[in-house]
């Protein structure tokens, strides 16, 4: 991200510190965004160091193309393709660290035409990669009440999922023109949510759920997590920032599962060193949240959680 106050990289130093940068190491920034983490990683690398950055947002790719550092390369893709990219570059098992900054970026929220924000009027798009797949508008125009309610409940933990789904589908069936604008959808949702939270817009959970579904965000994360063990070198680090409970739960459970050995009955003559042979990861420290100062400077960082693990 740029140095604009609107585009402040969340947990910048903490996430990069989590990688324990080796000057001549090879690193992957799976979510380039506007380049805040990537630029800091490059500043810590020596002449033989290398950074591969990935993003599926064409605007992020345009920003990355302004970096002329020979140690840096950008790939237009989703971060679930990290194993394929590393395979093509003959880097499987050689990566010293992977950084993922999950969710939607500030520039994406701030640009009304991207359709991510219920606070700005724009076309109802919500795609991270605007060159691929159905937009939110196209999907909502064809979805059933049951399917929409499932998405809102599963990915937004929305308690009024059925009521909202009925309102959205009913509107699209009866109106001469389908729902096509962000504020239009936000108002339809607000009109049917019976209880208002003064600290949260009634459309917050629904917009999150639709965005996650449109971009297959949790599937992407699962693929990236499962491939990390193959891609990372021994002592390679995984540094992941999540912004909502669904993402953080996945990251936490993955790291916990991969850092615990099999349960062995007490009394068996097995050395602890033998048990640890089959444990692929170890967690590094505790989860890190933004400081009060960072939250004050950048309120969007409030829900961020950083978790770090190291391959054994």
From Swiss-Prot:
It catalyses: cytidine(1402) in 16S rRNA + S-adenosyl-L-methionine = N(4)-methylcytidine(1402) in 16S rRNA + S-adenosyl-L-homocysteine + H(+). S-adenosyl-L-methionine binds at residues 35-37, 55, 79, 101, 108. One of its GO terms (cellular component) is cytoplasm. It is an enzyme of class 2 (transferase). Its EC number is 2.1.1.199. It is found in: Cytoplasm. Its main location: cytoplasm. Pfam families: Methyltransf_5. InterPro entries: RsmH, SAM-dep_MeTrfase_MraW_recog, SAM-dependent_MTases_sf. GO terms for biological process: rRNA base methylation. The keyword Transmembrane does not apply. Specifically methylates the N4 position of cytidine in position 1402 (C1402) of 16S rRNA. Belongs to the methyltransferase superfamily. RsmH family. NCBIfam families: 16S rRNA (cytosine(1402)-N(4))-methyltransferase RsmH. This is Ribosomal RNA small subunit methyltransferase H. The gene is rsmH.
């Amino acid at each position: 991200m740029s140095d604009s106050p609107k585009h402040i990289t969340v947990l910048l130093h903490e996430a990069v510190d989590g990688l324990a940068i080796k000057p001549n190491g090879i690193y992957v920034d799976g979510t380039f965004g506007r380049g805040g983490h990537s630029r800091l990683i490059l500043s810590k690398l020596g002449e033989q160091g290398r950074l591969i950055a990935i993003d599926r947002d064409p605007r992020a790719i345009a920003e990355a193309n302004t970096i002329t550092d020979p140690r840096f390369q950008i790939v237009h893709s989703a971060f679930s393709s990290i194993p394929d990219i590393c395979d093509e570059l003959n880097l499987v098992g050689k990566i010293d660290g992977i950084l993922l900054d999950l969710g939607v970026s500030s520039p994406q929220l701030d640009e009304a035409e991207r359709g991510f924000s219920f606070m700005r009027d724009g076309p109802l798009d919500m795609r991270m990669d605007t060159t691929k797949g159905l937009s939110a508008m196209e999907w909502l125009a064809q979805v059933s009440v049951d399917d929409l309610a499932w998405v809102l409940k599963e990915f937004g933990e929305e308690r009024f999922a059925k009521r909202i789904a009925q309102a959205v589908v009913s509107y699209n069936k009866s109106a001469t023109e389908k729902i096509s604008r962000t504020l239009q959808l936000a108002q339809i949702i607000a009109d049917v949510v019976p209880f208002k939270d003064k600290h949260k817009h009634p459309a917050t959970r629904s917009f999150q759920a639709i965005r996650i579904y449109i971009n297959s965000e949790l599937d992407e994360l699962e693929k990236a997590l499962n491939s990390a063990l193959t891609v990372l070198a021994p002592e390679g680090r995984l540094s992941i920032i999540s912004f909502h409970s669904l993402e953080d739960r996945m990251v936490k459970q993955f790291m916990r599962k991969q850092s615990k050995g099999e349960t062995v009955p007490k009394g068996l003559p097995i050395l602890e060193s033998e048990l640890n042979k089959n444990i692929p990861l170890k967690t590094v420290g505790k989860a890190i949240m933004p400081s009060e100062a960072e939250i004050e400077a950048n309120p969007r960082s409030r829900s961020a959680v950083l978790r770090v693990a190291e391959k054994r």
